[in-house]
């Protein structure tokens, strides 16, 4: 059994490697040929399974020898993006300082290479499957093609929003990234300009249309089912409902409100909103799929991200703070003093009656002088009852040394065994799409055309989180007063509901919001307490220099320049 060799798409340093009987790709292309696949039994299925199995778990960028703690797949980009705003605080500066403090973010840096390596590697995998499926795929190849089109759309959707200086609704001509599809030749790659927002989102929607066609049942003129729709066995591969969700996201981005609402509604079918018991589950909270999860990824016990570096190059190490400090002692968040916190102002805007507030340690606990009483208060958050573990996490966070704002939304897996052994505890699942997002998209999209109807939908959703919710008190503008109080209210719900799930910075860009890190009582790190009335330009990711060196048609975004020193304290939001 040999490995498929790596293919360099000029700008991609390391790409997808699959285990199969195929010896090599045609050098002039970015895909395997049909003859190669047909001569390797079962290889098509390997290509399809690799579309999702490579999303997390391996050191795709730097390799296992480097063990980078930001090199663990698609969920790493949640953190890398969202610490650029205000909703996530990174109190001790280390691995994620690049993105929180805007250090070394230019085109010649690893922060530029990282998304290029990952995303174009994933896109190459999609191109392979699309090419191998043929023009008119049948049977299992319909399922494979549908998944490939859906995922390619999702990847380009992320890239478009990360790299475009302006969102679609502001500037349709704003440049995104070069489009590489299943027909792009090596020669094409050398003169491949960045697609405009208009062209990119057209391409994304076309991919999603194809995905919908392949993943839903095929019927004849009489309505008889000729080919059944794709029936997945778990949430770790995209089906038609995920395509509906991706369309809802896309149409929200392009401002096509009716279509956004339509597809968000369709995506909700078959799923159930998380209730308090599920959202605040101390053992399975946000580490195990439930009836609200539409699409997700999971780390496996034999993943390099788990086996190498004590499991510390993984999502669990960054987000799961309940790891026994004496038995295991591992975890960047739990025991190395590098947790991610919720922004204090955002936390304080969450009413006490909203159950989502229970996922974050109350800042008032830091005012308790008696250690025994403090541990007792923290024990209310702990699955194990070990409040002293949470206290330890705060105490070892150099420069912060507090517990207020620590997150326990993303729980350690495996119960007591996982809390004692990170090789079990970090084997978690992470949602990429939840039905709650669809309810919020529907509410915003409906309300953009009929505000009263949108308010009704938003209120109905919010009252599933807080029975005492009253519309109209969460409408801070963050610099952009052109968005209505209703849109601001929708944004606040998204910030709270989807905290840590990779949406914060993308929403800031979509809504053209500023950021506010410096305010009375802030928990943001000194020297990085920046306020901006407009969307920071550092949120426009630079294209890696190797791409612009070899692709002469590709322009770049300006290298981000961080502010010097803290901003004046904000008195309003």
Mark where each language-model region is:
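Sec-dependent bacterial lipoprotein signal peptides
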Residues: 1-20
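Membrane-proximal, proline-rich intrinsically disordered regions
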Residues: 21-76, 264, 346-351, 359, ...
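Short, surface-exposed recognition loops and adjoining beta-strand edges that mediate ligand/DNA contacts
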Residues: 32-38, 69-77, 163-173, 217, ...
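Conserved, well-structured interaction surfaces
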Residues: 90-163, 195-198, 212-216, 423-430, ...
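Hydrophobic-face positions in mid-chain alpha helices that act as interaction patches
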Residues: 237, 261-431, 435, 467-476, ...
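TPR-repeat structural position
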Residues: 257, 451-452
């Amino acid at each position: 059994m040999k490995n498929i060799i790596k293919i360099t798409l000029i700008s991609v340093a390391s790409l997808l490697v699959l285990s199969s009987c195929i010896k090599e790709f045609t050098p002039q292309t970015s895909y395997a040929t049909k003859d190669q696949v047909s001569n390797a039994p079962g290889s098509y299925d390997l290509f399809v399974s690799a579309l999702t199995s490579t999303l997390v778990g391996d050191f795709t960028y730097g390799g296992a020898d480097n063990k980078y703690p930001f090199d663990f797949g698609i969920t790493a980009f949640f953190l890398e993006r969202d610490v650029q705003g205000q909703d996530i605080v990174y109190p001790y500066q280390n691995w994620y300082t690049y993105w929180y403090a805007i250090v070394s973010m230019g085109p010649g840096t690893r922060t530029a290479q990282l998304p290029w390596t990952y995303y174009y590697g994933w896109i190459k995998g999609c191109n392979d499957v699309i090419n191998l499926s043929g023009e008119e795929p049948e049977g299992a190849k319909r399922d494979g093609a549908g998944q490939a089109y859906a995922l390619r759309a999702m990847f380009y959707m992320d890239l478009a929003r990360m790299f475009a200086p302006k969102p679609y609704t502001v500037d349709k001509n704003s440049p995104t990234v070069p489009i590489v599809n299943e027909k792009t030749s090596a020669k094409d790659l050398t003169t491949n300009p960045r697609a405009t927002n208009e062209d990119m989102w057209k391409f994304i929607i076309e991919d999603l249309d194809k995905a919908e066609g392949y993943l839903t049942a095929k019927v004849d003129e009489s309505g008889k089912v000729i080919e059944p729709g794709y029936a997945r066995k778990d949430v770790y591969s995209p089906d038609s409902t995920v395509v509906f969700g991706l369309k809802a996201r896309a149409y929200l981005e392009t401002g096509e409100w009716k279509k956004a609402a339509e597809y968000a509604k369709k995506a909700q079918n078959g799923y159930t909103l998380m209730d308090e018991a599920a959202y605040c589950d101390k053992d399975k909270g946000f580490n195990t799929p439930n009836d609200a999860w539409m699409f997700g990824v999971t780390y496996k016990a034999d993943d390099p991200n788990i086996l190498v570096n004590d499991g510390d190059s993984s999502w669990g190490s960054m987000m799961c703070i309940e790891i026994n400090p004496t038995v295991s002692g591992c975890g960047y968040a739990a025991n190395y003093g590098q947790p991610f916190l919720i922004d204090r102002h955002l936390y304080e805007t969450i009413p006490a009656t909203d159950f989502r507030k229970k996922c974050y340690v109350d800042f008032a606990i830091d005012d308790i002088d008696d250690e025994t009483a403090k541990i007792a208060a923290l024990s209310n958050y702990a699955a194990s009852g070990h409040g002293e573990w949470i206290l330890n996490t705060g105490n070892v966070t150099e420069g912060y040394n507090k517990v207020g704002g620590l997150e326990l939304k993303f729980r350690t897996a495996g119960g007591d065994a996982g809390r004692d052994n990170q090789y079990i505890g970090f084997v978690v699942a992470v949602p990429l799409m939840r039905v709650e997002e669809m309810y919020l998209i529907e509410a915003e999209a409906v309300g953009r055309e009929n505000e009263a109807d949108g308010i009704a939908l938003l209120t109905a959703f919010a009252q599933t989180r807080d029975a005492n919710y009253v519309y109209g008190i969460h409408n801070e503008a963050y610099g952009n007063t052109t968005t209505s109080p209703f849109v601001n209210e929708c944004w606040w719900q998204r910030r709270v509901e989807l905290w840590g799930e990779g949406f914060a910075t993308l929403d800031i860009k979509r809504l053209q919001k500023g950021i506010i890190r410096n305010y009375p009582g802030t928990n943001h790190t000194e020297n990085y307490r920046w306020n901006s009335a407009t969307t920071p330009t550092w949120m426009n990711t630079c294209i890696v220099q190797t791409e612009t060196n070899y692709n002469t048609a590709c322009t770049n975004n300006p290298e981000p320049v961080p502010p010097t020193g803290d901003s004046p304290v904000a008195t309003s939001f």
